[in-house]
Each structure stands twice: as structure tokens, then as C-alpha cells.
């Protein structure tokens, strides 16, 4: 333990040494600018693992699975063998014989880098660094990670990189320690370096829980000029409660036993394999095993980390606490979790207190009109859970949490005509949300069918940055530029194609005619990107047009070669997007068809049950 703590101390010292120039750098910070502090969400902070000599051996931004088998101890191998043996016996006897403790033991081996000692420190040398400087003081690696995960060049250009900070934290952490850390970061890093007495906080997703608890613990700090919430989880997310409490949708068996499994984003072949494999055990035994896995996961990784408990909505918290936080060993955890659940319930009063006492400006940017798992495809497995088709969300967090107080009906449905006709209600154009109940209606913006990953919606981000730069104060200031109700945008592919086009120009191989055509396509694309009133259909057409032109030029000038890649030190022109559609592999086609046919026959014979259920029914 002492050695681990020494290593951690050395690592943190190194981080501070390479950023000590931050104070000098920020001497150039603009006096009339309030520094901006981003508080990122899940997957936006990077965590590093070091060996006993302080050498980095791994890094991750979410879950890290320990596949370094050479590091396994004899006890670790025993735990893993117990699990594998238990699964084999379970299949053989058609009954779940794998205990929750066996699963927990295996999880402790696989996710050891997220485990904590009794004193709260991590078992291994694991650090999620908070750099004591603005992004101008970041090293190349840290700056690259920040730029990819929080694209904010427009803000940087306006206020200077010396006024942009980021407070990082691990998703497997402590909500109260994170809030205390944010306070220390503001008081001891941001304010002294910038000379400001205020900050602008930009919480993103889970980051809202950190800010909420910061305001809970330090209500009279008076340091916050603005809070600009970007899809913030102010009151958790029902789908996370579903996950932690193993509350599955009644139609979940359809996903497991039929071709509806493809709705969660798997391909036809994989879906058919799942359909077949799921029948190996009787349905009840599959349920038992699944419940044990979830319970073990929650007890191993979520209960020790109150940051994740903070994602449980306040109206589901008591059920969670009754199930997982009983007993003396959980006294401290429960006290903290109880306190934060109370903070969630009182979020309106807390924010109003900041507004009234300190003049804090409050802004919210949110996506809506999707069921859980119903947008990008990255969260398709959320379709397994109970609230997936009764919510109105950005596919991860419901709109009443990201835009607190907003009323809604399920995504894809509408309030009644009578409700909409009531002038006291302010219903969205699609009819699924009512903003009249939002706690801060005049400073809340909504993006229809926008999924949780907002980094590819430049308009949503530009809105946040214009608010930070005092260019926007309310929905009434910017009805034409930033309407309160806007639409989904995903510029990921279009931005890639534009970047590829710039590389083609560098080559200087195009004819005058082709060069002019590509430049026109780029200009047209940039014009669409600049349009702040989003038309998804136009976005999609523009993206496809850009792809088509690039594909034609890549083929015509033979640009998808190793020689060109080496010349440019860039491999974007070799994207599969630019290659002609190839004939599918015949073996894959045959296997997909065969497995699909087998899966359908099994569905006809066995329905939504396992093989064992059928035989027990017969005999």
C-alpha cells in the first residue's frame, strides 16, 4: 500500500511539473473574460494505470478489463476457473449452479483496476489526472484527447486557450470527493491563475451530478457566474435504475429469442447465433443467471463508487438503497447516497438559490423524442429495459433530467389536442414535450431526436459557447439563430469527408474541372454546416453528396494507395466509404441464411423459451 501511494504521488508530481508553466501562461489571460471549466461526462476523462516503477501500462476512458493474464495470481485463476466450471455444469444439468459470489470473484479479477481498498484508494496504481492548468498547458497527448472529446475551437478562438479548463474524474469514483475536488480546482487552480473571481461551469452528461453536489456542499461559495448544462444528468436516468435493479422490459424475450435482436444493433448472423445460444438453458435459468450477474456487478463496481449511484433517479433511489445499501458495511456509502438523492430532489430550489443570491445564470441544452437505446445504435441494449418505451429521452437520459422540470409523453407520441390547445402549455412542434413546466424555460433549448453524443452537433455546441461568450441570454434573443426547438445533427461523417478533401487538395493532382467541382462541394457543405436551423434531410443529402464526389475522385486518380498514404502521412483516403460496394462473402451469406433459418425454425418450435423448457413441458 505504501509503495502504491508513493507511485501515485510521483505520478501526480510529474503531472504538475510538466504543467508548472501554467501560471506564466495564464498571465496573458484576458481580464474581461470569465474562465470556462468543463466537467465532462462518462467516457470523456482518461484514466491511466502505472506499474510499480511509474511506467504507464494501460489507459482507458470507461471500463477496463484486465486481460493481462500473466498478472493473474493463483487465486485469480481459481476464481476464473470456478466461473467457467460453473457455467459448464449449468449447461450440463440445465440449472443455474453459478453462485453470485462466484460471479463476483470473477468480476474482481476482470475489473481489478476499478476496485478500491478499505481506505478508498484504488487497489492498483490508477490515476485520472486533473491538470493544474488551462488546456494551453496540456501536453500533446492530453490536448489531443481533450480536442477529440470536447470540440470547442470556436470558444478557444474567442476567449483564448488560457481561459479554458477541464475538471476530470473517473466514472468509478466518489460523488462527494468529486464535488470537493471541483471546489479545490476552482479555488486553487482556476481563480488564482486567471485572476477572476468567477467561473463558468459547463457540465456534460454525468458531469451535472458533480456540479449539483458541488452546489449542495458549497451553496454559498458564490463562484459560479453561469452554468451551461449540455445533456446533463441532473436527476439521473431511469435506464440506469433499470439496469441496477434488473428491471427488464416485458418484450425483452422477443429480443433474445427472435430476429428482433437486430434492433439492438447486432448483425443478422450474430443475432441468429444469440437466438440459438440463448435456448441452451431454460428461460428461468437464464433469468436467474442474468440477475446474479447484474447483482454481482452492482455490488462489485457500483456500490463502492457513489458517482454511479448518483445516476439513479430520486424516485427509484429508495428501491436501490433497500436492495444494495443495507448493513453496517454500507453505512457511510448510504449516508452519502441518501444525501445526494435529497440533493437531486431539491435541484430546483438549489439552482434558484444560486440564481437569486449570486445572480448565477442557468442554461440547459438537451435532446429529446427518443426511447432509451433508440438513436445512434451505440446504446441498443437499453431496449432490454423496462422504461425504454415509456420515456422521452436522448436515448440515455430522459428529458426531465437533462432539461429539469420538462413534462413529456413517450417518444414518438403526442399530448392530446385538448392539452396542446391549452394556452398555458407550451408544447413542442412534434407534440411530445411541454416546456411550460421546465424550471428555467426561457433558457432551455431542445433538439428533436438528438442522441446523447452531442459532439457532432456543431449548433448545439456553438449555442453553449455563444452563451459562455455573452452572445445569447435567453430563447428570446436568438429565435432565428438558435430556435428553442431545433433538430438532430451528426456531422461525424461529413467532417471526415471534408478533412479528406483538404488532403486531396494538398496532392495537387486534380484537373481544373475536378478541382472546381470538389471546391464547390466543400463550400456547399460548409454552408450547410453553418446553417443554425437544422434540416436533417439536407444534412444527409449533403453528406452523401460529399461522399459520392470523394469516392469518384479517389477512384479516378487512384488515391487509395500505400504510396499516397505515405506521401500525405494520412490514411483517410483509404476509407471503405470510398470503395465500391463489394459482393458479400459467399460463406458469410450462406452462414447467415442457414443460421437465420435455424433460428426461425427454433422460434416456431420452442417459442420464447429454452430447449429445457420444451422437454420439461413434454415430460
Give the label of every model feature segment:
Residues 1-11:
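Bacterial N-terminal signal peptides that target proteins for export
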Residues 11-19:
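Bacterial N-terminal signal peptides
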Residues 18-32, 614-615:
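Sec-dependent signal peptide cleavage junction
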Residues 30-202, 208-260, 371, 390-395, ...:
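N-terminal non-catalytic accessory region
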Residues 177, 181-184, 210-213, 493-496, ...:
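Extracytoplasmic/secreted proteins, especially bacterial periplasmic and envelope-associated proteins
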Residues 251-331:
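Alpha/beta-hydrolase-fold enzymes
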Residues 319-496, 572-601, 605, 609-612, ...:
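C-terminal subdomain of alpha/beta-hydrolase-fold enzymes, centered on the catalytic histidine
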Residues 487-578:
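Beta-rich interaction/scaffold domains
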Amino acid at each position: 500500500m505504501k509503495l502504491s501511494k508513493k507511485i501515485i504521488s510521483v505520478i501526480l508530481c510529474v503531472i504538475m511539473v510538466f504543467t508548472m508553466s501554467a501560471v506564466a501562461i495564464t498571465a496573458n489571460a484576458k481580464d474581461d473574460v470569465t474562465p470556462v471549466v468543463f466537467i465532462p461526462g462518462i467516457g470523456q476523462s482518461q484514466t491511466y494505470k502505472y506499474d510499480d516503477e511509474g511506467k504507464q501500462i494501460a489507459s482507458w476512458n470507461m471500463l477496463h478489463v484486465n486481460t493481462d493474464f500473466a498478472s493473474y495470481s493463483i487465486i485469480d485463476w481459481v476464481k476464473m476457473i470456478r466461473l467457467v466450471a460453473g457455467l459448464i455444469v449449468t449447461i450440463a444439468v440445465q440449472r443455474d449452479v453459478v453462485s453470485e459470489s462466484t460471479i463476483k470473484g470473477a468480476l474482481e479479477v476482470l475489473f481489478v483496476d476499478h476496485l478500491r481498498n478499505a481506505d478508498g484508494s484504488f487497489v492498483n496504481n490508477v490515476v485520472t489526472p486533473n491538470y493544474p492548468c488551462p488546456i494551453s498547458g496540456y501536453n500533446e497527448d492530453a490536448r489531443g484527447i481533450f480536442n477529440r472529446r470536447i470540440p470547442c475551437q470556436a470558444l478557444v478562438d474567442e476567449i483564448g486557450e488560457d481561459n479554458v479548463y477541464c475538471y476530470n474524474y473517473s466514472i468509478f469514483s466518489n460523488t462527494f470527493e468529486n464535488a470537493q475536488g471541483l471546489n479545490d480546482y476552482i479555488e486553487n487552480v482556476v481563480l488564482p491563475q486567471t485572476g477572476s473571481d468567477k467561473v463558468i461551469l459547463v457540465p456534460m452528461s454525468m458531469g451535472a451530478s458533480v456540479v449539483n453536489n458541488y452546489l449542495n456542499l458549497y451553496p454559498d461559495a458564490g463562484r459560479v457566474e453561469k452554468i451551461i448544462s449540455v445533456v446533463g444528468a441532473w436527476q439521473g436516468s431511469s435506464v440506469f435504475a433499470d439496469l441496477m435493479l434488473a428491471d427488464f422490459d416485458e418484450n425483452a424475450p422477443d429480443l433474445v429469442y427472435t430476429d428482433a435482436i437486430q434492433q439492438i444493433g447486432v448483425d443478422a448472423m450474430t443475432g441468429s447465433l444469440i437466438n440459438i445460444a440463448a435456448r441452451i438453458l431454460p428461460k428461468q435459468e437464464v433469468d436467474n443467471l442474468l440477475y446474479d450477474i447484474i447483482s454481482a456487478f452492482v455490488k462489485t463496481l457500483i456500490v463502492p463508487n457513489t458517482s454511479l449511484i448518483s445516476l439513479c433517479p430520486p424516485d427509484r433511489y429508495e428501491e436501490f438503497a433497500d436492495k444494495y445499501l443495507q448493513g453496517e458495511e454500507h453505512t457511510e456509502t448510504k449516508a452519502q447516497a441518501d444525501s445526494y438523492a435529497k440533493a437531486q430532489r431539491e435541484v430546483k430550489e438549489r439552482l434558484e438559490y444560486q440564481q437569486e443570491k449570486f445572480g448565477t445564470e442557468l442554461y440547459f441544452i438537451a435532446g429529446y423524442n427518443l426511447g432509451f437505446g433508440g438513436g445512434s445504435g451505440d446504446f441498443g441494449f437499453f431496449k432490454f429495459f423496462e422504461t425504454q418505451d415509456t420515456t422521452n429521452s436522448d436515448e440515455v437520459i430522459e428529458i426531465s433530467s437533462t432539461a429539469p422540470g420538462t413534462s413529456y409523453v413517450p417518444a414518438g407520441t403526442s399530448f392530446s389536442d385538448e392539452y396542446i390547445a391549452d394556452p398555458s402549455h407550451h408544447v413542442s412542434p412534434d407534440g411530445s414535450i411541454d416546456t411550460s413546466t421546465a424550471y428555467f424555460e426561457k433558457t432551455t433549448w431542445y433538439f428533436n431526436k438528438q442522441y446523447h453524443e452531442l459532439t457532432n452537433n456543431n449548433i448545439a455546441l456553438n449555442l453553449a459557447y455563444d452563451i459562455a461568450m455573452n452572445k445569447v441570454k435567453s430563447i428570446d434573443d436568438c429565435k432565428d439563430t438558435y430556435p428553442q426547438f431545433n433538430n438532430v445533427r451528426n456531422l461525424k461523417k461529413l467532417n471526415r469527408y471534408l478533412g479528406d478533401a483538404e488532403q486531396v487538395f494538398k496532392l495537387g493532382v486534380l484537373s481544373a474541372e475536378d478541382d472546381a467541382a470538389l471546391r464547390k462541394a466543400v463550400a456547399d457543405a460548409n454552408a450547410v454546416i453553418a446553417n443554425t436551423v437544422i434540416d436533417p434531410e439536407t444534412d444527409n443529402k449533403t453528406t452523401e453528396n460529399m461522399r459520392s464526389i470523394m469516392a469518384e475522385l479517389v477512384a479516378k486518380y487512384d488515391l487509395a494507395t500505400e504510396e499516397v498514404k505515405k506521401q500525405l502521412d494520412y490514411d483517410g483516403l483509404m476509407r471503405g466509404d470510398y470503395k465500391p460496394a463489394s459482393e458479400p462473402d459467399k460463406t458469410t451469406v450462406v452462414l447467415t441464411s442457414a443460421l437465420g433459418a435455424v433460428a426461425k425454425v427454433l422460434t416456431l418450435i420452442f417459442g420464447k423459451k429454452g430447449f429445457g423448457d420444451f422437454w420439461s413441458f413434454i415430460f
